[in-house]
Regions:
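Post-His helix in hydrolase/transferase enzymes
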Residues: 286-298
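Helix-rich cap/lid subdomain of alpha/beta-hydrolase
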Residues: 160-209, 222-227
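Active-site loop/oxyanion-hole signature of alpha/beta-hydrolase fold enzymes
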Residues: 80-133, 137, 294
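Hydrophobic, aromatic-rich cap/lid helix
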Residues: 29, 209-234
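Conserved hydrolase catalytic core segment
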Residues: 128-164
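Catalytic histidine-centered segment of alpha/beta-hydrolase-like enzymes
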Residues: 277-289
């Protein structure tokens, strides 16, 4: 059973053009979009219709959404991007920093703002208005990108971790595990303690083809956790966001942070609709993909 509250509609029409490189799969197109700082972001597209961009969560890459693409493709030109440092996207820029001893070292220049700019850059590369679906931390980036470009006509946010919590202690423990060669344990620790994904959901994730990539890329998660711990939710800003938004949540999601974030968005966004997937947690798209895709499609198509 799905609980619904009601909402609105409205679109901003803008146009742009982009060219893609065709892959061996004639239904799939892969391109690279340069973000504001020059980082190349990989995007894979399929289908026909208005553009729908999917922004994945904290671990994994665009392949995480491949099972859902055929469900969206009849209705949209659906594009799944690799966030910086994930999949085929570049990690991001480094800058030379001179110390007090005049020693020059290379330093990572990562920031959440650059993730916002990445999403906005991909959106701006697409023709016409763009729908954006963001899962978990990808939802934070999708939301903030809507303040950087007017081309986002609708948002779908699935449990973005927006609340002001410091998780650097978790990041420290994960870093020690990685240094000890316990990469998979570091990933499981993240999944259990931050989004509080259930053991059953983690077991299901381990069976997915994307799991080895999640383990291999767990280092990137450290910088994201540290940066997200500095993020501050601004309800006043959210009240000014004039973009129709579908908020998605699972009734069995255990994380108080994720629950509070959805409630905060419900209370502040002027044009929002909430759908709660009964019996589901943080990864409903894995267990009920058809229902998930139908819910998103109906909202984006104006049927709700």
């Amino acid at each position: 059973m799905i609980k619904r509250s009601a909402l609105i509609l409205s679109c901003v029409l803008v146009s742009a053009t982009v060219s893609f490189a065709q892959t061996a799969d004639t239904l799939s197109q892969v391109s690279f979009v340069k973000s504001k700082d020059g980082t190349r972001i990989a995007v894979e597209c399929t289908g026909k219709g208005p553009s729908l961009l999917i922004v994945h969560g904290g671990t994994g890459d665009r392949s995480r959404w491949k099972p859902l693409l055929p469900l969206f493709a009849p209705h949209f030109t659906v594009c799944a991007m690799d966030r910086r440092g994930h999949g085929d996207s570049e990690t991001g820029g480094r800058s030379e920093v001179r110390s007090q001893r005049s020693e020059v070292r290379s330093e990572e220049t990562y920031s959440l703002k650059k993730e916002f700019e990445d999403v906005a850059a991909v959106v701006n590369s697409r023709p016409g208005p763009v729908f954006v679906l963001g899962h978990s931390i990808g939802g934070v980036f999708a939301l903030e990108a809507a303040f950087l470009t007017k081309k986002i006509s609708k948002l779908v946010l699935y449990e973005p971790p927006l609340q002001d919590l410091d998780h650097t202690a978790v990041a420290d423990r994960m870093e020690r595990m990685i240094q000890a060669g316990e990469r998979e344990q570091a990933l499981v620790t993240f999944l259990r303690e931050l989004p509080m994904i259930s053991p059953d959901e983690i077991a299901a994730m381990k069976r997915q083809p994307s799991w080895p990539g999640r383990v291999a890329g767990i280092d990137i998660q450290i910088r994201e956790i540290r940066s997200l711990s500095k993020y501050r939710f601004d309800g006043k800003r959210m009240k000014a966001l004039d973009v129709p938004t579908l908020l998605l949540a699972g009734s069995k999601t255990a994380s108080p942070q994720l629950k509070q974030a959805i409630n905060s968005l419900k209370d502040t966004l002027p044009k929002r609709m909430l759908v709660v997937f009964e019996g589901q947690g943080h990864n409903a798209m894995d267990k009920i993909p058809a229902q998930f895709a139908e819910t998103v499609t109906k909202f984006l198509s104006g049927e709700q």
